[in-house]
Swiss-Prot record:
A GO CC term assigned to this protein in UniProt: perikaryon
Residue(s) carrying N6-acetyllysine: K112, K165, K176
Taxonomic lineage: Eukaryota, Metazoa, Chordata, Craniata, Vertebrata
Top EC class for this record: ligase
Result after altering R157H: In CTLN1; loss of argininosuccinate synthase activity
Phosphoserine found at: S180
Outcome after substituting R265C: In CTLN1; severe clinical course; loss of argininosuccinate synthase activity
Record-linked PANTHER family: ARGININOSUCCINATE SYNTHASE
Impact after mutating W179R: In CTLN1; mild; decreased affinity for aspartate; decreased affinity for citrulline; decreased argininosuccinate synthase activity
Enzyme Commission number(s): 6.3.4.5
General function of this protein: One of the enzymes of the urea cycle, the metabolic pathway transforming neurotoxic amonia produced by protein catabolism into inocuous urea in the liver of ureotelic animals. Catalyzes the formation of arginosuccinate from aspartate, citrulline and ATP and together with ASL it is responsible for the biosynthesis of arginine in most body tissues.
Annotated protein name in UniProt: Argininosuccinate synthase
Amino acid sequence: MSSKGSVVLAYSGGLDTSCILVWLKEQGYDVIAYLANIGQKEDFEEARKKALKLGAKKVFIEDVSREFVEEFIWPAIQSSALYEDRYLLGTSLARPCIARKQVEIAQREGAKYVSHGATGKGNDQVRFELSCYSLAPQIKVIAPWRMPEFYNRFKGRNDLMEYAKQHGIPIPVTPKNPWSMDENLMHISYEAGILENPKNQAPPGLYTKTQDPAKAPNTPDILEIEFKKGVPVKVTNVKDGTTHQTSLELFMYLNEVAGKHGVGRIDIVENRFIGMKSRGIYETPAGTILYHAHLDIEAFTMDREVRKIKQGLGLKFAELVYTGFWHSPECEFVRHCIAKSQERVEGKVQVSVLKGQVYILGRESPLSLYNEELVSMNVQGDYEPTDATGFININSLRLKEYHRLQSKVTAK
């Protein structure tokens, strides 16, 4: 069979993408396997050997951890992004980062196709493909789980296992957990399997990034986190003096401390972009600490009205990231506006991390809008109390008129 051309497969080394690799070869493609090191616990060399053994023409293992932190996580921290009030977007942020490198490899290797193992019901198919089409409009995407010839052949995990046996694909000796997991530097997600029943509690042993808060240390870690332009630039453990200043090391250290204290666990039902609700359990240790610390220093340094506008932009940013529009012009515009709002978000925040909680202890900033003398109950400062009378009278006018009308309506 003559080759249909080269395809760059986003490969994880797991059962699904290993079967997809072999299946793509069956279809006549030359497969280039691409593994993104985005902070997950993975034996990358073992995955490389496995991909080559299964017939991959080339294997690229790309460490994108630092750019993931600096170019994707930091903008999310600046924006205080939460999807539907709770989800810190760990998976959503990783996908455009992974896809960007996948497209780079495809262009460098002259591949016309890219492929992924995302299911036809989830958000990731959208995130991967919108990123790929944005960065390389001529690229063609092969999405096996949306192709009838694939999903009619592989109707479940048992079919994949049988295919793996037939084609010499190594199968894990230990039974797979009855749920799916996806990990990166920012978080780990758990879904599907027994978790599809939203009533089922997370089974013991599910969580891997964080300690059970009930079993966490009884003594807190006190951290001082320094921000410049809304980005963390230094973290210091006040108790033992440990300091980290580079982005990746800082983030990894916060993951370690937060994980030890059981910080960052959530169990939610969310609305997928394609229209269905899904249940997800997430651990986002460092991201949770930084969310709270950044929120505090931002409130301390940012003008009230600017912050109201910025909060709206943060909601839009979260929606765009969740739905896969990272590379869209509107998301670029929103990121630029948020970055502008962060120019004076500078200072230090002290936090206590204890038994699943993050407590703000104090903050300081050379650019704070907080005026201790002005707000003091003991010092009048540059404020005339009698001015408040007119302020209250003007603001009460609208309320008086509204209730005057209500009285008339009620009387009738």
